[in-house]
């Protein structure tokens, strides 16, 4: 055993809403920390050796799918990208992300929320003419393509939603993910909608005007999307539409 090896404590909020006898409670697990150990590795060791009933989500293990997002010491993070060594005390408290339907323990249903958001902001390219999918898409300038790609890097992990104070007060608020998605299509020349069209979708208190600019979303996004500037640009464009009415 290495002299530098330490024992860490992982506290998990456990609860199964589908069980008539389950009650929310914290359960502690102790395990030996290994070099470069992530929370994903720790949780898998816990489930394999201590608690096979522990529920959490994962797919890619590389910070690409967003499935393993959870509250880590009160802050939303990706378990697969969070090193246990970054917590000096060695005590790590894990809870499911708020604002999403709880499935069990650390597992929440982000899929239904993002599907509903996708429909609300109509996040697909709108064309006034029927699109011939057998022909190449209309070309765009490299700068535009880069701007669209930058906003399109969202992995739908839900960290921005879980950290949003407005979302906790307004259940129907589309959050940074929704506003970023709207902005992504506003700057895409393949989408033929104008600002008035987007105003009908996000120009209210459940949309961009409900944002209190706390910018927790910007601070917690694991992909470091430019959410602050994206939301500010969207708000300015929607304000111009609102003033013209």
Swiss-Prot record:
InterPro entries recorded: 2Fe-2S_ferredoxin-like_sf, 2Fe-2S_ferredoxin-type, 2Fe2S_fd_BS, 4Fe4S_Fe-S-bd, 4Fe4S_Fe_S_CS, Beta-grasp_dom_sf, Helical_ferredxn, SDH/FRD_Iron-Sulfur
Gene: frdB
One BP annotation, GO: respiratory electron transport chain
Segments forming domain 2Fe-2S ferredoxin-type: 17-98
Protein source organism: Helicobacter pylori (strain ATCC 700392 / 26695)
All copies of domain 4Fe-4S ferredoxin-type, residue ranges: 145-174
Family: Belongs to the succinate dehydrogenase/fumarate reductase iron-sulfur protein family.
Catalysed reaction equations from the record: a menaquinone + succinate = a menaquinol + fumarate
Positions that bind [3Fe-4S] cluster: 164, 211, 217
Residues at which [4Fe-4S] cluster binds: 154, 157, 160, 221
Source species, domain of life: Bacteria
Cofactor note (record): Binds 1 [2Fe-2S] cluster. Binds 1 [3Fe-4S] cluster.
Name listed for the protein in its UniProt record: Fumarate reductase iron-sulfur subunit
